[in-house]
């Protein structure tokens, strides 16, 4: 689990969400609506869906915590910082209440499925930056109650740039909690590739 005596940490691992299991963490009206079969987040972008590159068979499959632990053993990784995959498009969620509910559901699902399974997993929570005060609350809950090491912010989709003053309370709370904030690319609209 070390290379030349240095522990190996995967700082950008991605879980493939189990959508059916995740849906069970959403408030009852979402479950009953039947609208969220197979996916909760918006699609990343057309750049990903229209690409003709070939994937290795089995790539991007949902392996769960057992598959992750097996992989980590096979390649000698001591710990992994795990991110959402579907949630890379979380910035595109426009309904504030839905953003809050999805963040809470994803964080609860991930904590139950991964963080409680092994201390070798570290997680970056989703926080609803669409409503900064709610993001502060969810960051605090994710770190202090669920055991996340910080939060992930999608790089695109929000109304202001990530340095906007409206988001400063989130960064102040992260500083107070001594936790990390990771900004992760994934959705590419508005970055010059679509003009």
Go through the PLM ranges and name each one:
Residues 1-195:
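Helix-coil boundary/capping segments in enzymes
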């Amino acid at each position: 689990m070390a290379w030349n005596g240095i522990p190996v940490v995967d700082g950008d691992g991605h879980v493939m969400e189990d959508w059916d299991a995740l849906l069970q963490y959403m408030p009852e009206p979402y479950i009953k609506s039947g609208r969220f079969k197979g996916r909760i987040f918006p699609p990343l972008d057309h750049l990903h869906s229209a690409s003709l590159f070939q994937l290795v068979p089995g790539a991007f499959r949902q392996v769960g915590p057992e598959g992750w632990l097996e992989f980590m053993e096979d390649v000698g990784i001591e710990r992994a910082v795990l991110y959402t995959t579907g949630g890379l498009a979380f910035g595109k969620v426009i309904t504030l209440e839905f953003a809050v509910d999805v963040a809470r559901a994803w964080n609860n699902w991930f904590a139950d499925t991964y963080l409680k399974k092994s201390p070798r997993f570290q997680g970056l929570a989703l926080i609803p930056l669409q409503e900064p005060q709610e993001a502060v609350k969810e960051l605090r809950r994710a770190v202090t109650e669920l055991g996340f090491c910080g939060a992930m912010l999608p790089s695109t989709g929000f109304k202001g740039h990530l340095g906007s003053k409206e988001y400063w309370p989130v960064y102040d709370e992260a500083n107070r909690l001594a936790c990390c904030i990771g900004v992760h690319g994934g959705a590419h609209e508005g970055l010059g590739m679509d003009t």
